[in-house]
Amino acid sequence: MATDTPPQLAGPPTPAMETLDRDVVMSPRKRRRLSASAEPELTEPESDGTSGGRGAAAEAPETAALEPKSLFNSTSTESSITSSSTTTTTTSSSSSIAPFLAKHIRDQHASRNRFAPADSSLPRRKADSKYCYRHRPDLKCRRQADEPTVDQMQRDLSTLSQNDQQSIAHFWSLFSAAPSKHRNLMLQGIVAQCCFPQLSFLSASVRDLIRIDFVTALPPEISFKILSYLDTASLCNAAQVSRNWRHLADDDVVWHRMCEQHIDRKCEKCGWGLPMLDRKRLKDTKRQVQLRAAGKEAVTGRQQQQHRPWKAVYMDRFKVGTNWKYGRCTTTIFRGHTNGVMCLQFDDNILATGSYDATIKIWDIETGKEIRTLRGHESTIRCLQFDDTKLISGSLDRTIKVWSWRSGECISTYTGHQGGVLCLHFDSTTLASGSKDNTIKIWNFQDKSTQILRGHTDWVNAVKLDTASRTVFSASDDLTVRIWDLDTGKCIHTYAGHVGQVQQVLPLPREFEFKHTSHCDDDRSDRLSGSESPDHRASHDSNHAPDLPTTSAPPTQPMSPLFEALFNEDRPAPPRYMLTAALDSTLRLWEVHTGRCLRTFFGHIEGVWGLAADTLRLVSGAQDHMTKVWDPRTGTCERTFTGHRGPVTCVSLSDSRMATGSEDCEVRMYSFKA
């Protein structure tokens, strides 16, 4: 009795195998034509008398059992490959599959190859030398399938016959062992033979699988860099993805950058700007943020609790900025003066006001109650300024007084002006004052010296010191604004353009940014040129008021050569931009170093008396009883506040508050805090 020979693992391909190879890439129509013309003949393997072929075939299904939890696991793949290669039922499948598996298993898993011993003399390549991060075997290529998917596949597989189970297991083993190029070719062949429902199934299955969690895969520094490009809404959405994403999206490194982009400036991307809360904290924690971005611990836990998270800072500033934008605020009215309020200033929880009734009142902002009244001047209080220790006031009685506002004591009195004192401004070492006598007086706190700046031909209504550049700005009833050198006492430049008495001048913070256009918005005739009319050219030391045209403003003078000569690397230049307000009902934005009027703000119907500004907005108060909030970059009026029953004579501004004083004897405080 003849016995069947065991299947051979190597040999020439049979007609059946050739037909199967053609069928992989053959269209269904061509396959039907070929099968009708030539039916392949299956030959029974020869017997060598050692074992029965049918018995080996019968054992194959039992030895090809699929391990459900390791369908795509490299270890289970190798065991499946070994089992499959030894239990193949036909010579054709054995002769084609086994060499393929042996070759590619040796290439990809040389250290655990069961087909041939590893050659220790060959240099081992790095695991990621041939693969991108998506296909690196040590990362993603041999990823474990999720439990529900594997269980469902096992249940579906168990419903098939043993031969079908073995065939599918062989196909999985073949695909698992194939390199990237072969896998792509196999997938192309499969996709080419799929019908539309099968393609739809593929699309739905792959949609979620191709998503990569880059936050987990990348180093924290790179993840921080990517997240820092998101806007606020996107960052909040990212924090909802997972715990790991939330941990990174809420980190101080990301929100510190967000605060830098928006707080105290306008973001170029979204157009939002948020008010500055505390500049000191930004400097103190800069080093800590850099260390955290580098993956290092910046501070101890106890120290870290002393600082608010930057996300909380942003949230607070965002709420305040939104309140400014939509005009949501609470109003507190301070009543106590018996005559019109002419000047005011507030800081933290203290408000100081000066009035026609010759008194200065100190108020508690939170309670709205008067703390004390400073008495000593004999006439109207036109100007005041205070810091932590002292308050300085100027009056129409021609004197300047220094007070201890906490105790109410008058420390000293300065005299020297020949007319009423209309304005003052001081820093740590210097006091500047302007008067009805058309002069500016500079008082030195340290050496008690004084200096007089002459050049204006009418009352000096406003002065502002710039400590860094050692300059002072002044505005006058002679329709001009001047900038002076404190070291020499000379006028550096005169700015002309208003057709009404200039009441206020305000240098903007150096952080203020303005997008320039090719020409001035309004006074195109005021642009600097080398050929000004001699009729409108005035000397810096002229003692006569310029001739005023009836239909247009006098042109600005060319920039003085002194400007470029004075300010260089050793001496900082003055702020680049300044604002002015005048009784011609307009405000103007100027470029200081060129003398150009960049923008004119129209909206008030009577003269403007009060002016305050920061990097985000400016506030003006006018004879028309109205207070307006403007965007300095666009020139648009964002909001108008009414309520005063008299002209608004003075205004003051902070990040979350605005105060206005009026001739109706009232002070109104608007709070935009969240």
Swiss-Prot record:
Gene giving rise to this polypeptide: sconB
Listed Basic and acidic residues bias regions: 518-544
PROSITE patterns the UniProt entry points to: FBOX, WD_REPEATS_1, WD_REPEATS_2, WD_REPEATS_REGION
Family membership noted in the UniProt record: Belongs to the WD repeat MET30/SCONB/SCON-2 family.
Disordered: annotated segments: 1-96, 518-561
WD repeat start and end residues: 336-375, 377-415, 416-453, 455-496, 557-600, 603-640, 643-674
Native species: Arthroderma otae (strain ATCC MYA-4605 / CBS 113480) (Microsporum canis)
Biological role stated in the UniProt entry: Component of the SCF(sconB) E3 ubiquitin ligase complex involved in the regulation of sulfur metabolite repression, probably by mediating the inactivation or degradation of the metR transcription factor.
InterPro entries in the record: F-box-like_dom_sf, F-box_dom, G-protein_beta_WD-40_rep, Quinoprotein_ADH-like_sf, SCF_subunit_WD-repeat, WD40/YVTN_repeat-like_dom_sf, WD40_repeat_CS, WD40_rpt
Pfam families: F-box-like (PF12937), WD40 (PF00400)
SMART domains recorded: FBOX, WD40
Name of the featured protein: Probable E3 ubiquitin ligase complex SCF subunit sconB
Highest taxon in the source lineage: Eukaryota
Family annotation (Gene3D superfamilies): 1.20.1280.50, YVTN repeat-like/Quinoprotein amine dehydrogenase
Complexes and interactors: Component of the SCF(sconB) E3 ubiquitin ligase complex.
